[in-house]
From Swiss-Prot:
Any one GO biological process: mitochondrial electron transport, ubiquinol to cytochrome c
Cofactor: heme b
Record carries keyword Transmembrane helix: yes
Annotated protein name in UniProt: Cytochrome b
UniProt KW Iron keyword: yes
Family of the protein in this entry: Belongs to the cytochrome b family.
Chain ranges passing through the membrane: 33-53, 77-98, 113-133, 178-198, 226-246, 288-308, 320-340, 347-367
Residues at which a ubiquinone binds: 201
Organism: Harpiocephalus mordax (Greater hairy-winged bat)
Gene that encodes the chain: MT-CYB
Location relative to the cell: Mitochondrion inner membrane
Its job: Component of the ubiquinol-cytochrome c reductase complex (complex III or cytochrome b-c1 complex) that is part of the mitochondrial respiratory chain. The b-c1 complex mediates electron transfer from ubiquinol to cytochrome c. Contributes to the generation of a proton gradient across the mitochondrial membrane that is then used for ATP synthesis.
Residues that hold heme b b566 according to the record: 97, 196
Co-factor remark: Binds 2 heme b groups non-covalently.
PROSITE patterns, A to Z: CYTB_CTER, CYTB_NTER
Length: 379
C-alpha cells in the first residue's frame, strides 16, 4: 500500500515540497534563509493578528491603543516587540537571501528571481505602512515625507498624493487605509511565496558551485529539515535577545511622542532597513531624480540576470567578482549609515559617492569583470 503522504492529494503537495524534495547534497547554510523567511512571515502574521485585536486605527486613539497593548494586555509588550523586531529579522534574512542569490548566481532562475523581487517590493510596502500605525512623531512625518515623494511625478503627482492621503494631509483617512493594507498585504505575500516556491521547484535549487547537481541529490527530510531547525534556533535566540533585553534598540525614540503636525522632528528618517535607499534618494538634489534613483536602486535587481556576462554561474571560483561583491556589500552598509545621519558636510558628499559607486558596481563593473575573467580563463 502506498504511503498516505504520497497518495493523499494535499499531503502529496507537502511531501513533494518538504519531505521527498530532491535537494543538492552540497548546499551550505546560506540556503537556510528561505525557510527562515517563511517562519518570519508566519510569526509576523500571527503576532500582527493578535495586535490587530487590540489596535484602533483612529488618529485620536491609535497611539494610546499601542500604549494600552504594552501596559494592559497580557503579554501585549511581547507581541508588540516580537512584531517590531520580527520585521527587522525579516529584513536581515531577506537581504542575506538576496545577497546569497547574487553571489551564487541564483538569479539565473529568472522566474523565481523576478517573483522574489516583487516579494521584496511588497514586503517593503507592508513594513512602511506598519511603521505609520503607532502614530508617533516619526510615523506621521515618515508617512508625510515618503508619500509626498509621489508629487514629483509630472502632471498627476499632486492628485495621486491627495488620493493616497484621502484628503489634503496625512490624517485619519490615511491611517485607516494604511491599517487595512497592512493587514491585507501579508496574505498577498503568502500567495506570492507559493508562486516563488512553485517556480523554484520547477528547476530545483542552485548550489555553491553553480554546476547542475542532478547527479547528486538527497531528500530534503531529514538532512535539510535538521539544518533548517538549527538556523531557526539561532534566529530565535537573536530575536528573543533583542525582544527581551533591548527591544527599542532598532526603533526611533521620536516615535514615543504622539504625532504632532505642528512640530517637525529634527531628523526625519525611516526604519534602519530602508536607510540605504533613503540615502540614495537624499544624495540627488532634484526631487524627481531622487525618486527615480530610489525606485531604480531596488528595481535594478530585475536587470541583474541580463548583466551576467561570466561563463561561470557562481562567484565561488571568481576572485575578482568576489572583491566587487564585497565592495558592494560595504557600500550598502555605508549608505545605511549615511541615511541615518543629518544632511550636512561631510555626509552629503559621502552619500553621493556611495550612491554613484552602488550603481557603477552593478551596471558597469560587474559585467566588465565577468568579461575580463572569461578572457583570463581563455574562454
Amino acid at each position: 500500500m502506498t504511503n498516505i503522504r504520497k497518495s493523499h492529494p494535499l499531503m502529496k503537495i507537502i511531501n513533494n515540497s518538504l519531505i521527498d524534495l530532491p535537494a543538492p547534497s552540497n548546499i551550505s547554510s546560506w540556503w537556510n534563509f528561505g525557510s527562515l523567511l517563511g517562519i518570519c512571515l508566519m510569526l509576523q502574521i500571527l503576532t500582527g493578528l493578535f495586535l490587530a485585536m487590540h489596535y484602533t486605527s483612529d488618529t485620536m486613539t491609535a497611539f494610546n491603543s499601542v500604549t494600552h497593548i504594552c501596559r494592559d494586555v497580557n503579554y501585549g509588550w511581547v507581541l508588540r516587540y516580537l512584531h517590531a523586531n520580527g520585521a527587522s529579522m525579516f529584513f536581515i534574512c531577506l537581504y542575506l537571501h538576496i545577497g546569497r542569490g547574487i553571489y551564487y548566481g541564483s538569479y539565473m532562475y529568472k522566474e523565481t528571481w523576478n517573483i522574489g523581487i516583487i516579494l521584496l517590493f511588497s514586503i517593503m510596502a507592508t513594513a512602511f505602512m506598519g511603521y505609520v500605525l503607532p502614530w508617533g512623531q516619526m510615523s506621521f512625518w515618515g508617512a508625510t515625507v515618503i508619500t509626498n515623494l509621489l508629487s514629483a511625478i509630472p502632471y498627476i503627482g499632486m492628485d495621486l498624493v491627495e488620493w493616497i492621503w484621502g484628503g489634503f494631509s496625512v490624517d485619519k483617512a490615511t491611517l485607516t487605509r494604511f491599517f487595512a493594507f497592512h493587514f491585507l498585504l501579508p496574505f498577498i505575500i503568502s500567495a506570492l511565496v507559493m508562486v516563488h516556491l512553485l517556480f523554484l521547484h520547477e528547476t530545483g535549487s542552485n548550489n555553491p558551485t553553480g554546476i547542475p547537481s542532478n547527479t547528486d541529490m538527497i531528500p530534503f527530510h531529514p538532512y535539510y529539515t535538521i539544518k533548517d531547525i538549527l538556523g531557526l534556533m539561532v534566529m530565535m535566540m537573536i530575536l528573543l535577545a533583542l525582544v527581551l533585553f533591548t527591544p527599542d534598540m532598532l526603533g526611533d525614540p521620536d516615535n514615543y511622542m504622539p504625532a504632532n503636525p505642528l512640530n517637525t522632528p529634527p531628523h526625519i528618517k525611516p526604519e534602519w532597513y530602508f536607510l540605504f535607499a533613503y540615502a540614495i534618494l537624499r544624495s540627488i538634489p532634484n526631487k524627481l531624480g531622487g525618486v527615480l534613483a530610489l525606485v531604480i536602486s531596488i528595481a535594478i535587481l530585475f536587470f541583474i540576470p541580463f548583466l551576467h556576462t561570466s561563463k561561470q554561474r557562481s562567484m565561488t571560483f571568481r576572485p575578482l567578482s568576489q572583491c566587487l561583491f564585497w565592495l558592494l556589500t560595504t557600500d550598502i552598509l555605508t549608505l545605511t549609515w549615511i541615511g541615518g545621519q543629518p544632511v550636512e558636510h561631510p555626509y552629503i558628499i559621502i552619500g553621493q559617492a556611495a550612491s554613484i559607486l552602488y550603481f557603477s558596481i552593478i551596471i558597469i563593473l560587474m559585467p566588465l569583470i565577468g568579461l575580463m575573467e572569461n578572457r583570463l580563463m581563455k574562454w
